[in-house]
Amino acid sequence: PMALSFRKSVLSAERYESAGVFDVNGDGIPDIVSGGYWYEGPDFKRQHKIGGVTAHDEYYDDFSTIAMDINGDGRLDFVTGGWWGETLRWRENTGVADQDWPMHDIAKTGSIESTRAWDVDGDGDLEIVPNTPGKPLVVYKLIRDANGKGTGKFTTHKLKFSGRENDHQGHGLGFGDITGNGRGDFVLTNGWLEAPENPYEGEWIWHPDFNLGRAPSVPILVVDLNGDGKNELILGEGHGYGLTWWEHNLDATGKRIWTSHAIDPYSSQ
């Protein structure tokens, strides 16, 4: 078999909190987007301005870069937000070279550890889900017109929990099918939420089956690692050391048993 090799390329001296890969200029070639700039593919040597990003000490307030055509103009914009700004936002791709991309607020959310995009309601479109420790779990759904194009507006859906004293998140968030019924369930720090038939109106059933630690990663991956038809969990320690996977089994009574296995206990974040 052919051996793999990798070559490191330094794109810029700037540092930001996140990066995304998507076609900014519509030429069919993926570009790299990070913070205040995007880098034109395929060699990523040409740097283009996006606009300023608020800095807080050594951090920037851009803890995600999620590509989505939010206003339906055919150009990919992106969703971002951060810890200190406590606001979920999107930046508008104007299509004009080196013109600042306008920033639009989606919602005041509380401090955002990171944001993910998952198809929560199974309609084939991605929803936006920020991980906001100490705050409720809320899904933001892009409003689309009759042609399926984004309108630049979102609806807000605060999920209802059943069997839990509060509806707060911790540090760490995952999404995937735990039960095998085809619906996506949410994985939190110390348990998981079983999806109802209607994710926005029904109650999500709380299962305190495990404790993933103080600050598991965003995302927590939900995937069948051992080929037994049940999804396992993969997570890293967000502010410490360790990469682990959690094996998912059922005992004779049908109770779910989760067993932690170390992948790499020595690496950080």
What is the role of each PLM region?
Residues P1-Q269:
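Beta-propeller-forming repeat regions
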